[in-house]
């Protein structure tokens, strides 16, 4: 599944944190009115959203959507980051094949364009998969830094 979003617009992050459950735990049931991004550092998270089950492991990124009920379905230890945010131009994609064709065309236009032109041949709408995996060491330092900035809560952070 893909979500489209306007990359020219920044998300509004409401909450950011890290949780480390060292004893087996199961996610509580809830429906929120914002996106929630989970990034699994270690362990496992067994989560279902609107009845669809997902098994998340270290290195997995997973995006929960607003208005959909999510809850755990199996206990596990889990160490993860989370970010609650809203975005004014983010939505589920109805036709993934058309979205991929659109991305390919944007790439083609970008490659044949003259890079010193003021005019950008593409628009800022792009796509993000609901779930993807990165080797866990690639994202941990960046996420730690983001969490440190959030926790410092300096003026205009």
What are these regions (language model features)?
Residues 31-47:
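Short, conserved beta-strand element in jelly-roll/cupin
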Residues 14-32, 69:
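Conserved short histidine dyad/triad with adjacent acidic residue
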Residues 30-32, 57, 156-157:
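C-terminal/domain-terminus segments
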Residues 46-48, 64, 69-75:
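Short beta-strand His + acidic residue motifs that chelate non-heme Fe in jelly-roll/DSBH
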Residues 2-15, 69-155:
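A hydrophobic/aromatic-rich effector-binding and dimerization subdomain
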Residues 51-65:
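Short acidic-glycine-tyrosine-enriched beta hairpin
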Residues 35, 60, 81:
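Residue-level detector of short, conserved catalytic/binding motifs and their immediate flanks
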